[in-house]
Amino acid sequence: MKIRPLNDRLLVKRLAEEEKTAGGIIIPDSAKEKPAEGQVVAVGPGKVSDSGERVALQVKEGDLVLFSKYGGTDVKLDGEDFLIMREDDILGIME
């Protein structure tokens, strides 16, 4: 199934989280937090400004992004977990 985000929304796949700490301690599943990093899989056409013009998004497909911990809506597509979020929920693009 394919999905095309609308307006200023993005489809983001969370990056896998670390299984161990820097000191080598293995983190159990019950103690793990959802990562706030992901890769942009699809982007909408952009936001419509007050003047009626479409403003392109700053992020593009393939960008690695840092997003708000509680931002976005969890969705499951073809057995994989994704987030649909607004561009405003993106805190930065990782380079």
Curated annotation (Swiss-Prot):
UniProt KW Cytoplasm keyword: yes
Compartments where found: Cytoplasm
Pfam families reported for this sequence: Cpn10 (PF00166)
GO cellular component, as recorded: cytoplasm
GO molecular-function terms, A-Z: ATP binding; metal ion binding; protein folding chaperone; protein-folding chaperone binding; unfolded protein binding
Assembly: Heptamer of 7 subunits arranged in a ring. Interacts with the chaperonin GroEL.
Protein's recorded name: Co-chaperonin GroES
